[in-house]
Regions:
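Extended, compositionally biased flexible segments
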Residues: 1-101
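Generic beta-strand structural signal
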Residues: 48, 78-80, 101-105, 133-135, ...
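Catalytic-pocket segment enriched in acidic/His residues
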Residues: 2-21, 36-45, 112-199
Length: 199
């Protein structure tokens, strides 16, 4: 059966060495860094990370971030992006990493003033988290070339000034556990691994 209108192009991310990775869903995982979980009133030893979604169209590998409208307070958090090529029900933990196609560095942009307003009104945060170009992402690096990093520095600088610095080893829920919580293929899981030093 034919579409009645032309379907939109498939969102995708560039791959180091060439090619594109198609993206169907983007799951974001918060409170995955102990200090940040405590700061947000959670218990890092008990509470699993919560999930929310960004629109795949919000992914942006252009290297530019136009300041969004309707906000005077945009915050940034550097993240680890995990690209999944497979998914399914009841994936054994020991096989979870087989679902991972590659990794990238990403940034979660938040219109913090709109988020605070939504919290006060007990409304969803979507307007603060899911907006155009709210998920800058670097090029994907295949796991076949770098393996599955469990540790390693991840940093963010603004105009040359270091704003975030940490190590992947500081994540409460490791990639293998986060992969097991997600059952979709052609997805990107953006895992919070750091606390923003200036927030």
């Amino acid at each position: 059966m034919r579409y009645v209108i032309d379907p939109p192009p498939t969102p995708s991310l560039p791959v180091r060495g060439g090619g594109l990775f198609p993206v169907r869903r983007v799951y974001c995982i918060g409170r995955n860094y102990a200090a940040h979980a405590v700061e947000m009133g959670g218990d890092p030893n008990r509470e699993p990370p919560f999930f929310f979604q960004k629109n795949p169209d919000d992914l942006d590998a252009s290297g530019r971030f136009p300041y969004p409208r309707r906000s005077r307070n945009v915050h940034h958090e550097v993240e680890l992006a995990v690209a999944l090529a497979a998914g399914g029900e009841d994936i054994p933990v020991e096989r979870a990493l087989e679902c991972v196609w590659g990794y990238a560095v990403a940034i979660d942009m938040t219109r913090r003033d709109l988020q605070d307003e939504a919290k006060k009104l007990q409304r969803p945060w979507e307007i603060a988290k899911a907006f155009a170009r709210s998920a800058p992402v670097g090029e994907l690096v295949p796991a076949s070339t770098i393996g599955h990093p469990a540790r390693g520095a991840i940093t963010l600088a603004v105009d040359g000034e270091l704003r975030q610095a940490g190590d992947l080893a500081q994540m409460i829920w490791k990639v293998v556990g986060l992969t097991g919580l997600n059952r979709s293929r052609a997805s990107v899981v953006v895992a919070e691994g750091l606390r923003t030093s200036d927030q």
